[in-house]
Amino acid sequence: MPGTSPAAAALRLLECGVDFDVLRVPEPAGRWALRRLIGYGQPALRPGPVALEGASACLFFVAPGAQEDLPQLLEWLDWGGIELGLRAYGAGDRIPEPRVWLHDPQAPAPEVIALLATIAECCSRRLLRRQYDRETVNQSRG
C-alpha cells in the first residue's frame, strides 16, 4: 500500500477485491485485536497492513475473497448471527487511501481466517463492555 501525501490520499481511492479485501473493525476493538495479534509472535497470525479510519474504525487489509467468505467464517467460528460491527469490502468496492497506518502498509495481506477469531473476540468484548457500562450507569441513576 504505497504512502502518499495526506492531500493526495484524500483524493485517491483504493480498489478492493484484486490485491486485497478490507475488514472494517470498530475502534477500539481493532486496536486491541492488533496488539493481541502482534503479541502472539507467530508468523501465521501476523497481521498485514492495518489503518485507522478516523476515530471510529480500524481497517485490516486481508487477502482477496474475505468479503465473500466472512459470513460463513463467522458462522464456522460460532459468531454467526451476532452483530459484531464488522464490515468487509471486496470486489467492486473502493475505499479512500488511509492517512494513518497502525501496522506496516507494505506487509502482505494475510488470509482473513488467520485473524478473524481474535478480531471477533475483541469485538464481542467491546460489545459486552459497552453493555456493562450502560447497566452500571443505569444502576447508579436508579
Residue ranges of each PLM-predicted region?
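A contiguous pocket-lining binding segment that forms or flanks enzyme active sites
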Residues: 59-97
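Signature for HUH/AEP ssDNA processing cores
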Residues: 1-55, 64-68, 79, 102-142
